[in-house]
UniProtKB/Swiss-Prot annotation:
Organism: Homo sapiens (Human)
E.C. numbers: 3.6.4.-
Binding site for ATP: D148, D149, M150, G151, L152, G153, K154, T155
Sequence ranges assigned to domain Helicase C-terminal in this UniProt record: 512-662
Extent of motif Atypical PIP-box: 785-796
Noted disease: Bone marrow failure syndrome 2: An autosomal recessive disorder characterized by trilineage bone marrow failure, bone marrow hypocellularity, learning difficulties, and microcephaly. Insufficient hematopoiesis results in peripheral blood cytopenias, affecting myeloid, erythroid and megakaryocyte lines. Cutaneous features and increased chromosome breakage are not features.
Protein's job: Promotes double-strand break (DSB) end-joining and facilitates programmed recombination by controlling how DNA ends are joined in a spatially oriented manner during repair. Also plays a role in DNA repair by restricting DNA end resection in double strand break (DSB) repair. Facilitates replication of complex DNA regions and regulates the maintenance of chromatin structure.
Span(s) of short sequence motif DEAH box: 272-275
Protein name stated in the entry: DNA excision repair protein ERCC-6-like 2
Listed SMART domains: DEXDc, HELICc
Entry text on domains: The atypical PIP-box motif mediates interaction with PCNA.
Residue stretches of biased makeup (Basic and acidic residues): 12-22, 830-840, 933-953, 1389-1405
Stretches assigned to coiled coil: none
Length: 1550
């Protein structure tokens, strides 16, 4: 090679660039044929043409144009003159990998910066996008955060960005450019000065520091130096001389060398694991913020690990000031989001939280980029993630309880109470700062928390030597106190410490682990066993040694060079099938793809640690499906740790993922008012020794809400309920088999059957447990202003019990009162049944009609009368009684304006009650994760359909029995979970979900059906299981109860299996239905005994899961299992609730204080829907009356004054009714100041509670102080309005009622026509005043008035109806900020109570006739009693004062939409002169009292004590009524002076 020759830059057709020394094909000087030669030098002539001096094999030289040279195609045997060719020198180059994309550079900008083709060919699209994101912020001189999930290649994206900015090519050219400058000059190649000036600093944890260097060396030719260890001073000199391009250092070294590094000019600072910058007060945060570089790039997959303050800290480092100050961020984002995430949040809290979430996401969107693992789902195997709750051994329980009973723990628990010395300070800050040994409460708190964690894992851990003398002293004292009760254990520990530590009998988890390892060894599974505690790893290691298992161990003490050796041995050696790994030490940089079972022996407080541990095996390169088992000690502090993980992960989903995450908890981290079930020392130092599972209770509670929402959603999508849905009701009527194909499309439209949840049904072991679990929900739901109605408290059982005789006689439920349980959104089974029922007579003519068609009420009545209920195989009388008591009525939900507008209204019209054991449901197994899958309905003959059903559906078809009923009900519930994902990381195809779901519903006594199941994989997707509906909800937990509740044992929920473990099908079931399996990411309860469901493609995997299920089923210490895959994230039901909360609060400005779990329709939506539904049925020339469309929204301060008037004085003109909203708000604030209120909110509350006269006087005084002449016509305006509105309103009401009657009559039966007509009259009376679009008085403010209009009839007494200001803001400009107060919960309750006073008589009549809620509350004089059997049944006679039950019976005809009745404003005092009734017990909010309500005898006693004349007595003697008499008396008698009660309304109370 001639070093003086000019460098080649000419391009040829064969190759872009030629270099001296390269081999080529050149024309032979003899015959012109191409032959091999080598380039000696390259020259350029005078004309600019490039020539190469080539040297042939015979040493001849010849000058040939570069264009004639061609590249040599190497052959294996071809001799090489050079050691490396260009391909060998390319970086990166993975010869065994195919290029994912073409080998072209990826252009980032027009100035020439691009990702070199050597790197770009291995990148995926999302990685190029990430590189472009980093480059964009670098160009603009700002920072950013790359927040991709673990395993998506953040390191590669950064390297791509560096290669582009440093103009790397990944070829020989980079080698030449990296040569020293004197060599470059000798080659007559000038170094690029611009590139030389660029220098980047990468800060990373020590554990991954050298991994960064390896990656940089692999992916390109970078000049890298490592600033760490002994050589950091020498390397720092090189950095100062700018002899490197990239400097690598650690957080600690950066802190030590901050001044030196700040003296250099860095092009950008890149920080790996940026979530370390999470504490504003931490030293590492201060150091990072002190770096003098504006381009700060952070890399983290978990930017939010514990709270939102961490997010702010990281973002404030990368982009200072982006999210404001810490105080501003907490007020604007953190508090609203966290409070809106509460399970008991109000609509305003939820809507405000979601709005804050969206604002935060919008604010961060340009500076924060996050992608999830769904991008690489096709490269990852399946993951089965399960929580395994292990019962403690008796010895563990005793020790755990003993620790909690120590004096120190008592001191901790009482530390926050007021000191006994009455100083006003807390005990821990006054007389009880330390214990008798001088240890502070804080020290004791942390020490005893550690002790409880040790006992929950293995009692022998208390005997282990501690790391510090203080800890050792404390542990010794605790052991002396605790083990004084167990001398045998202490003696054995001294004599045989090794044996004690390795003996599983001292730990419930160890017993489970022992059988798990044996199971994995048989199946040749390789197990990664993680533990956070190294002391616990010692115990596990000793167990492995005692068991003769070949294992490896890796923890923080393992040297770095040995780590890779251990990983390699474990992955490659078959004999080593267990590796003990420390959760923290093994969290980063380890690749255990050889393992397919991951066991987390103990949880950590930070969910990111556990996820990192799982990702050691579940990552790209894993060939087998991964099973993750997390062991949790039941009822201990570990359960709180896991639930806090869920809390943090849900918060991460909201803030980082901008998802409407499910709201499981009532707790808010850092809030003393909302410690809920998670936070506070009382939750940590608690032991649930009865075997109950807090996790199960919380997930079930959320599942009930979700199920109710989604069930209502299905109803709301079904259209006008005017037609029949053909479905045979009789249990022995055979289903037609030729309709499978026709039924398939109905899968998308049928009702969602996975929400058959009933709070009144027994949970776990006893029915009393249910009451205890649900009572707190009731009280917390009413924590917002408003008292729960009996509708929300599950009151239907009492009414149903009294009507049992009628039900048994004619198959029709006479009582039409219904309940939706404590959870307002939880619907009973019949709600779904009603949407899916078919008329038996129509079976032969039409098999599967559209689900828009609902059985006509008249036809239902006739049908039920002619049908005999078949009570099938009830095991005992107590069972029958319990089943009847658990029956509920359905709540048919209203229809909204679109399919996505799904709401739940607590008071809607109902369908008839269904006979037991008659309906079968067939939920389809097909469904995508993003679309709601609903379910069709079928029936089948119990006697004749066994063969066909078995072959088609793969279920056990026997004659209906408690066992079989239970099986089918459980199958049905689990079968509906196909809408959910299989993994929080991965989307699973529909077929996989089908198989997995079926495989997870297995029972011990159904092996005989497995062969049949393997015959129909295709049919299963279409025709799935047929299930019992009523038994489904009756036996949601088990139909087969024994005489003692305590003996009921369920495999997953029987927490004391030693004494209760019957091996029967009925008792070996798991109740997945308690969780909302309909939703995308919901938790599911995993049954113990799997039932095979075959598909050839995944049969091996299913067998693997079945094998694991079978193993877990046989472990006695496993108390409860649930899948962790669908717990985290959002759901469709939560999306509905969030959307409607925002709609109600921000658009309609109403219902803001209702619980967020209740969705409410607007009158606008209702009107549009009713117009669409009613118009086709209207006769020619007849329009639907306005009164029949409007809703009776009862508000305590309605606005009736809607006239627009103008008053003229000498110099001033006053316009009434057209005040702009801005002026209204402004003058309302002035009014608050005028009346010396401390705030606008206080003034709004004062107005709400003030009497009519007080409000009138306040308005007059305020405006008269500015305009004295206002006082003259102020009152006249009101009185004028009152008179005209009363007269005209009554006339218009009657006209509209007549129209509505003629409109509805053709579709109703005789009795229904009459009752509906009355309801129409009543509705019209409420809403007819809406026609008078009188505007509010405008004195540069919005003045509104209110009146109560009484409609009296000579024969029938009507209720006082308060006309409301029109909610439809499009109709009335007065729907403004002022009206929000009138929509507040207290106001609504007040008016509703006024209405109730005068409706007692009609309510009695209604109750006697047993009319459903499709029928009205008010009756005309010509009432007809449809069912004489119930004529003498009076709810008033049963309960006493039943006026509070008004909304139970309130209905508005066949209208598809109905606003809910408002809950009461608060608990009311019981009158002294009457006995305690049902409502008094509910007001006590006492778990014990509420649990009594499940006892039929108690309810009967209450009914007997109830006074009969209470409602009439109230009218005569208000002072002795249910409510106290005072200035704020809710049912105050009407007087003309009340018309001045219309004060200016504000949105403050909302």
């Amino acid at each position: 090679m001639d070093p003086s020759a000019p460098q080649p830059r000419a391009e040829t057709s064969g190759k872009d660039i030629w270099h001296p020394g390269e081999r080529c094909l050149a024309p032979s000087p003899d015959n012109g044929k191409l032959c091999e030669a080598s380039i000696k030098s390259i020259t350029v002539d005078e004309n600019g043409k490039s020539f190469a001096v080539v040297l042939y094999a015979d040493f001849q030289e010849r000058k040939i144009p570069l264009k004639q040279l061609q590249e040599v195609k190497f052959v294996k045997d071809c001799p090489r003159n050079l050691i490396f060719d260009d391909e060998d020198l390319e970086k990166p180059y993975f010869p065994n990998r195919k290029f994912p994309s073409s080998s072209v550079a990826f252009k980032l900008s027009d100035n020439g910066d691009s990702i070199p083709y050597t790197i770009n060919r291995y990148l995926r699209d999302y990685q190029r996008e990430g590189t472009r994101f980093l480059y964009g912020h670098y160009i603009h001189g700002g920072g950013c955060i790359l927040g991709d999930d673990m395993g998506l290649g953040k390191t590669v994206q950064v390297i791509s960005f560096l290669a582009a900015v440093l103009h790397k090519k990944g070829t020989r050219e980079d080698i030449e450019n990296n040569m020293p400058e004197f060599l470059l000059r000798s080659m007559k190649k000038e170094p690029l000065s611009s590139t030389a000036k660029k220098m980047f600093l990468i800060v990373a944890p020590l554990s991954v520091l050298y991994n960064w260097k390896d990656e940089l060396d692999t992916w390109g030719y970078f000049r890298v130096t490592v600033l760490h260890g002994n050589r950091k001073d020498n390397e720092l000199i090189r950095v100062k001389q700018r002899k490197c391009e990239i400097a690598l250092t650690t957080y600690e070294t950066l802190r030590l060398c901050l001044d030196e590094l700040n003296s250099l000019e860095w092009s950008a600072v890149i920080v790996d694991e940026a979530h370390r910058i999470k504490n504003p007060k931490a030293r590492v945060t201060e150091v990072m913020k002190a770096l003098k570089c504006n381009v700060r790039i952070g890399l983290t997959g978990t930017i939010l690990q514990n709270n939102m303050k961490e997010l702010w800290c990281v973002m404030d480092w990368a982009v200072p000031g982006l999210l404001g100050s810490g105080t501003y961020f907490k007020k604007q984002f953190s508090d609203p989001v966290e409070h809106g995430q509460r399970h008991t949040a109000t609509k305003r809290e939820l809507a405000t939280g979601r709005k804050a979430m969206q604002r935060l996401a919008k604010k961060m969107s340009g500076w924060f980029l996050r992608r999830t693992k769904t991008l690489i789902k096709d490269q990852l195997p399946k993951k089965e993630d399960r929580m395994v709750y292990c019962s403690l051994t008796d010895f563990q329980k005793a020790v755990y309880q003993t620790v909690l009973e120590t004096e120190d723990v008592t001191l901790i628990l009482q530390s926050s109470e007021p000191c006994t010395c009455r100083s006003g300070q807390k005990r821990r800050n006054c007389c009880y700062k330390t214990n008798s040994h001088g240890e502070t409460v804080k020290t004791l708190y942390l020490s005893y928390l550690t002790v409880l964690q040790k006992v929950a894992n293995h009692v022998a851990l208390l005997q282990a030597a501690s790391t510090s003398k203080q800890q050792e002293t404390l542990i010794k004292r605790i052991c002396d106190q605790v083990f004084s009760r167990f001398p045998d254990f202490v003696q054995k520990s001294k004599d045989a410490a090794f044996e004690t530590l390795s003996d599983p009998k001292y730990s419930g988890k160890m017993k489970v682990l022992q059988q798990l390892l044996n199971h994995c060894r048989k199946n040749r599974d390789k197990v990664l066993l993680f533990s956070f505690s190294t002391k616990l790893l010692d115990v596990l290691q000793q167990y492995c040694m005692a068991s003769g298992l070949d294992y490896r161990r890796l923890d923080g003490s393992t040297k770095s060079e040995e780590r890779l050796k251990i990983v390699k041995e474990f992955n490659s050696t078959q004999d080593v099938n267990i590796c003990l790994v420390s959760t923290m030490a093994g969290g980063l940089g380890l690749n255990f793809v050889g393992a397919n079972v991951v066991v987390l022996f103990d949880p950590t407080w930070n969910p990111a640690n556990d996820l990192q541990a799982i990702d050691r095996a579940y990552r790209i390169g894993q060939c087998r499906d991964v099973k993750v088992l997390r062991l949790i000690s039941l009822g201990t502090v570990e359960e709180i740790m896991y639930l806090r993980q869920i809390y943090k992960q849900q918060l991460h989903c909201v803030v980082v993922g901008s998802e409407n995450a499910k709201r499981y908890f009532e707790a808010v981290q850092g809030s003393k008012e909302h410690q809920g079930e998670l936070f506070g020392i009382h939750n940590l130092f608690k032991f649930r020794s009865q075997g109950s599972c807090l996790t199960k209770d919380i997930l079930e509670r959320e599942g009930q809400v979700e199920a109710g929402i989604m069930t209502a959603t299905t109803w709301l999508k079904e259209g006008p309920p005017a037609h029949k849905l053909e479905m045979p009701r009789q249990p022995d009527c055979q289903e037609c088999r030729g309709t499978e194909q026709a039924a398939e499309p109905l899968a998308k439209e049928a009702c969602d059957l996975c929400s058959d949840f009933s709070d009144e049904e027994p949970v776990g072991a006893t029915g009393i447990k249910t009451a205890k679990n649900k009572a707190p929900d009731s009280s917390k739901a009413s924590s917002s202003p408003g008292q729960l109605t009996l509708l929300q408290c599950g009151f239907s059982k009492l009414l149903e019990t009294k009507c049992k005789a009628v039900e048994d006689s004619d198959g029709n439920t006479a009582s039409d009162d219904e309940s939706s349980d404590e959870q307002p959104t939880c619907l009973s089974t019949e709600a779904k049944d009603a949407g899916c029922e078919k008329n038996q007579d129509s079976l032969g003519t039409s098999k599967h009609q559209k689900l828009d068609n609902i059985l006509n009420p008249k036809e239902k009545h006739i049908f039920y009368k002619s049908e005999k209920i078949l009570e099938q195989n009830i095991s005992s009388k107590s069972d029958e009684k319990k089943i009847k008591n658990t029956d509920k009525h359905c709540i048919l939900q209203n229809v909204t304006e679109s399919e996505d507008s799904d709401v739940i209204c607590p008071t809607q019209y109902t369908t008839e009650r269904f006979p037991d054991n008659s309906i079968r449901f067939k939920p389809p197994l097909e469904g995508s994760e993003d679309s709601e899958t609903e379910h069709t309905v079928k029936t089948r003959n119990n006697d004749n359909s066994r063969n066909t059903d078995d072959k088609r559906n793969g279920i056990i078809s026997k004659k209906l029995s408690p066992e079989n009923t239970t099986l089918k009900s459980i199958l049905k519930r689990k079968g509906t979970s196909d809408i959910s994902d299989e993994s929080d990381d991965i989307e699973i195809s529909s077929k996989s979900r089908v198989r997995k779901r079926a495989s997870s519903l297995r029972f011990k006594r159904i092996k005989e059906t497995k062969k049949e199941l393997h015959n129909s994989p295709k049919t299963m997707n279409k025709t799935n299981q047929v299930y019992a509906a009523n038994e489904d909800h009756n036996s949601q937990f088990i139909d087969d109860y024994s005489s003692s509740d305590e003996s009921l044992s369920v495999s997953h929920f029987s927490f004391s299996k030693q004494s209760h473990r019957p091996r029967t099908i009925r008792d070996r079931t798991s109740f997945s239905s308690k969780l909302p399996s309909h939703n995308k990411k919901n938790s599911t309860f995993i049954p113990r005994k799997p039932m095979k469901c075959s598909n050839e493609k995944v049969v091996n995997q299913e067998q693997s899961y079945e094998s694991m299920d079978k193993f877990l089923d046989g472990v006695q210490e496993v108390a409860y299992i649930h899948s962790n895959q669908n717990v985290i994230g959002s759901s469709k039901a939560e999306n509905h609730m969030s959307r409607w909360a925002a709609h109600d609060v921000f658009e309609l400005k109403q219902f803001s204080q209702l619980p967020a779990n209740i969705a409410v329709c607007s009158s606008k939506t209702y009107k549009e829907k009713v117009d669409a539904d009613t118009l086709p049925h209207t006769k020619k020339g007849q329009q639907p009356s306005e009164g029949s469309i409007s809703l009776p929204l009862y508000i305590s301060n309605p606005v009736n004054q809607k006239k627009k008037k103008v008053y003229h004085t000498n110099q001033t003109t006053f316009i009434i009714g057209e005040t702009p909203k801005g002026i209204r708000r402004k003058q309302f604030e002035e009014m608050a100041s005028y009346f010396n209120s401390s705030s606008v909110n206080e003034f709004a509350k004062h107005i709400t509670n003030a009497t009519s006269e007080e409000r009138q006087k306040m308005l007059r005084d305020f405006y008269a102080s500015q305009y004295p002449e206002v006082k003259e016509f102020f009152v006249d305006s009101v009185s004028q309005f009152n008179n005209s509105s009363f007269e005209k309103g009554e006339q218009r009401t009657r006209k509209k009622s007549d129209k509505r009657e003629s409109l509805i009559k053709p579709r109703l039966s005789d009795s229904e026509t009459l009752s509906f007509k009355d309801s129409t009259n009543k509705i019209s009376q409420v809403c007819s005043l809406k026609t008078y679009k009188r505007k509010s008085v405008k004195f540069q403010n919005h003045i509104s008035y209110r009146e109560e209009v009484f409609f009296n009839d000579a024969e029938t007494k009507k209720s006082p109806v308060s006309s409301t200001q029109e909610i439809d803001s499009g109709k009335n400009s007065q729907a403004s900020e002022d009206t929000v107060t009138s929509r507040s919960l207290n106001s609504e309750s007040e008016t509703r109570e006024r209405r109730l006073e005068n409706t007692m008589k009609d309510q009695q009549d209604l109750t006697r006739t047993g009319i459903s809620r499709k029928e009205p509350l008010l009756k005309l004089e010509n009432k007809k009693i449809e069912n004489p059997v119930l004529e003498n049944t009076s709810v008033i006679s049963l309960l006493g004062d039943t006026s509070i039950l008004d909304d139970l019976f309130k209905s508005h005809g066949n209208s598809p939409t109905q606003l809910p009745k408002k809950v009461l404003s608060g608990p009311m005092e019981k009158a002294k002169q009457r006995p305690k009734d049902f409502w008094d017990i509910l007001n006590e909010q006492n778990d014990e009292s509420l649990s009594k309500l499940t006892d039929l005898a108690v309810i009967e006693t209450l009914c007997e004590k109830a006074p009969l004349a209470a409602p009439f007595k109230r009218r005569e003697e208000p002072a002795t009524s249910l409510w106290k008499s005072n200035e704020k008396f809710l049912w105050k008698k009407f007087s003309p002076s009340d018309t001045d009660e219309n004060a200016t309304n504000t949105q403050s109370t909302t």
